[in-house]
Amino acid sequence: MIVVPVKEGENIERALKRFKRKFEKTGAVRELRARQAFEKPSVAKRKKMQKAIYVKQLQVAEE
């Protein structure tokens, strides 16, 4: 469970923004979407490799 204490005099919008950031970092939404349908381990591995190659190409192009 995510707990975001609201500080004295803190704007509720700012506290909500901190909550959203913490929630996003936990990866709960990503995990729920991934678990909606079964994915074979070989397919998951292939996707992971393709993503790694893509990120590597972006890094090389950036330099």
Curated annotation (Swiss-Prot):
Name the record gives this protein: Small ribosomal subunit protein bS21
GO CC terms, sorted: ribonucleoprotein complex; ribosome
Matches recorded under InterPro entries: Ribosomal_bS21, Ribosomal_bS21_CS, Ribosomal_bS21_sf
Record family assignment: Belongs to the bacterial ribosomal protein bS21 family.
Organism of this sequence: Porphyromonas gingivalis (strain ATCC BAA-308 / W83)
Pfam families: Ribosomal_S21
UniProt keyword terms in alphabetical order: Ribonucleoprotein, Ribosomal protein
GO biological process entries: translation
Gene Ontology molecular functions: structural constituent of ribosome
